[in-house]
Design a protein with these regions (language model features):
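Secondary-structure edge/capping motif, primarily at the C-terminal ends of alpha-helices
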Residues: 19, 50, 106-110
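Amphipathic alpha-helical segments used for helix-helix packing
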Residues: 36-58
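The cytosolic transmitter module of two-component sensor histidine kinases
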Residues: 24-25, 88
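Hydrophobic/aromatic-rich alpha-helical bundle segments in the mid-to-C-terminal region
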Residues: 57, 61, 78-130
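Short alpha-helical scaffolding segments that buttress acidic/His motifs in well-ordered protein cores
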Residues: 28-31, 43-47, 95, 99
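Short amphipathic alpha-helical interaction/hinge segments
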Residues: 8-13, 39, 71-75, 103-110
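Alpha-helical structural segments
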Residues: 1-22, 29-34, 62-73, 117-124
Length: 131
């Protein structure tokens, strides 16, 4: 469990080693890619196991909370988002929720063409919302 959580965090930090990216489309695409890749699938298997195992649930929940906070923080940095502005925090969280949803949709079918259209739309929405 710890390995999967650490690998997801490492992959996230490695997205843009120089920090904030000027291209929000690239940031959105990279975040979505994290949720459509093998590390997300591995995490999902842990989630399913934890949903039925009372002893496992607290540990997986703790790890996911940590990875979730780090993902949010890194997304804010990469998007140059100012969370002191009302609605910005929720916008970033919505982006991450959308990315997770696309990851779930990708489990059974490859919807890369639709996913690219959604990524493009979200990048435009973020440009408007974040300035």
């Amino acid at each position: 469990m710890e390995y999967v959580a650490e690998e997801r965090s490492t992959a996230l930090r490695a997205l843009f080693p120089e920090g904030a990216a000027g291209d929000r489309h690239a940031v959105v695409a990279a975040l979505v890619d994290l949720y459509t890749g093998p590390l997300f699938r591995a995490a999902l298997h842990l989630w399913v196991a934890a949903s039925n195992e009372d002893q496992l649930r607290p540990r997986v929940t703790e790890l996911e909370s940590r990875v979730g906070r780090e993902t949010h923080r890194i997304a804010v940095d990469l998007l140059s988002a100012d969370e002191s502005v009302p609605g910005v925090r929720e916008t970033v969280q919505g982006l991450l929720d959308m990315a997770r949803g696309l990851g779930l949709a990708n489990l059974l079918t490859d919807d890369a063409a639709r996913r690219e259209r959604v990524v493009t739309q979200w990048a435009e929405l973020l440009d408007e919302a974040l300035g």
